[in-house]
Amino acid sequence: MYDLFSKYDIQKLHTLSSSQTNKAFAFHVQTPTCYFLLTKRENQGKIELYDSLPNKYITFKLHKNIPIPLDFSSIINKFLKLTNKYGRLDVIKTNLPKKGVKIIEHPNVKFPFKNVKTTTLNKNKAPELQIRYSNEELPFNNQPKIIMGHKMYGFPYIDKEGSYGICSRDNYVIINKELKEMELIKEFLSTEVILFVFETTRYRMRYLEKYVFEFIPDFSKIDDCWNMFDNNNVDIYKLFGITKEEKEFIKNYYKIKYKYF
């Protein structure tokens, strides 16, 4: 589908989220949809995407392997300025354990290995790791890492000692970082702006997609991030040049104010 979209000149593209699609089709369809104006000629390297934040079409440049956002391309364009300069945040999407591994809820002598299955929200809207135990050591055990286990919002958790393996699919893991780098990355990922950016690639219902990390820079490589972090003054809005009006829109986007690890 991406190759088809990028082959021809799509002059204007308007997307509908899963909830918008559901309403448009009398609550019978939930997959995100779109409509567009196409000219059958070679693409011009850009698309005019409808952006509901400024309520107008925004130019989005097409790049190989860079996804097309469903919305808020004005914000994504600001992210890509830093991502193109410093490189994207490298994440690993986890798979199911190999065949033959057994998983249980409570540990015993034969099942001593701790693993993260997923992350859920408690009644106070705070994230909690859901732990399971395996009879074999699973991937990422004994490896310091950031775990993003919530299937919609990630919610980064630092496993400093590498205490956990991962026993389920569709978790995201960041490895090969020093502890201070992980702390900095977690600080920037634990923001409403990042939750907002996650909305731009909800291609399958409301799941967190790996595609979105193509938009997000490696914060540990940016000097301004270190200056903010070292001075205990992380301002992700300032980092990306997000305006006062955009900031207000983002802060009002989520009715629920989530907590972080």
Describe each PLM feature range.
Residues 5-6, 190, 251:
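Alpha-helix boundary recognition
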Residues 1-22, 35-38, 185:
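Conserved Class I SAM-dependent methyltransferase catalytic core
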Residues 22-248:
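C-terminal substrate-recognition regions of SAM-dependent nucleic acid methyltransferases
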Residues 245-261:
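Short, amphipathic C-terminal "tail helix"
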